[in-house]
């Protein structure tokens, strides 16, 4: 049953995404970016969340919304699944996602990403990528936007050892903005491999880390805060799925070496 529901979700997700982008693309050059964000990006995100709930049985629960600060902010989120690249969009005010450059090359999709002024990085050019990412993030945050980064740079399987990259500390030190850690357990329900599983993805928006801490202190704190909360959410999710809350052996990491997270 899970495989059937997963297939139907993916079919409806990719079909609706393609058709919506195709219908709206003639109007894309004429739209102000903020209008495009509300009309296209947020509608797409809410539609996908609806499909996840009604077709795949994947619900969501968010705690800690009161910790979201207005104005310039660096958001550092755990990355286990494709889920958070969609479902986190409506939670924040006009966030600029930091993402891998290759996503910009996808026909149609890349045009919308460019219009949203997300920040692409070339993960093969480490020092140049850090410089470009920082400059772009500084420009966007000066306009009052919030920057969202995945500190490990890529999806990590549930239970895999953390692999936080220096890029998040570099960005934090350069922006001079507080950092909002975000923990989640989405990898239990939308894994990279295998079917989606019904259940409740839990997101916890943690208390913000103040700006201008020493980078080493910040790096230790952001990893500690995210990983401790994620471990608790994963254990809760596993218990709800009827699994051992302590988990088994972790899958091997999927990728390594992102300069930006």
Regions found by a protein language model. Give the residues of each.
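N-terminal membrane-anchoring alpha-helices
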Residues: 1-61, 260-261
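Non-catalytic C-terminal accessory region of glycerolipid acyltransferases
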Residues: 3-4, 130-261
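Catalytic core of membrane glycerolipid acyltransferases/transacylases, capturing the structured
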Residues: 20-42, 53-55, 69-126
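Short acidic-hydrophobic, aromatic-tinged amphipathic segments that line or gate anion-handling sites
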Residues: 62, 119-122, 211
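Generic preference for hydrophobic
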Residues: 62, 75, 97-98, 203-205
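Glycine-rich helix-loop-beta junction characteristic of Rossmann-like nucleotide cofactor-binding loops
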Residues: 64-68
């Amino acid at each position: 049953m899970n495989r059937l529901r997963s297939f139907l979700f993916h079919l409806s997700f990719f079909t609706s995404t393609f058709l919506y982008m195709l219908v709206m693309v003639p109007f894309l050059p004429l739209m102000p970016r903020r209008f495009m964000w509300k009309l296209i990006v947020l509608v797409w995100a809410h539609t996908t969340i609806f499909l996840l709930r009604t077709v795949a049985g994947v619900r969501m629960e968010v705690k800690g919304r009161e910790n979201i600060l207005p104005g310039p902010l660096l958001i550092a989120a755990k990355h286990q699944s494709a889920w958070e690249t969609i479902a986190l969009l409506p939670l924040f005010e006009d966030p600029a996602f930091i993402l891998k450059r290759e996503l910009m090359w996808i026909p149609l999709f890349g045009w919308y990403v460019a219009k949203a002024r997300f920040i692409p990085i070339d993960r093969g050019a480490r020092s140049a990528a850090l410089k470009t990412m920082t400059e772009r993030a500084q420009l966007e945050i000066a306009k009052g936007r919030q920057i969202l980064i995945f500190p490990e740079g890529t999806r990590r399987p549930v239970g895999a050892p953390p692999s936080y990259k220096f890029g998040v500390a570099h960005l934090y030190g350069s922006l001079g903005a507080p950092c909002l850690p975000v923990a989640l357990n989405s990898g239990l329900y939308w894994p990279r491999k295998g079917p989606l599983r019904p259940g409740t993805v839990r997101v916890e928006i943690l208390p913000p880390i103040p700006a201008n801490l020493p980078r080493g202190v910040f790096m230790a704190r952001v990893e500690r805060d995210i990983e401790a909360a994620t471990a608790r959410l994963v254990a809760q999710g596993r218990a709800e799925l009827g699994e051992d809350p302590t988990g088994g052996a972790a899958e091997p990491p999927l990728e390594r070496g992102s300069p930006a997270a």
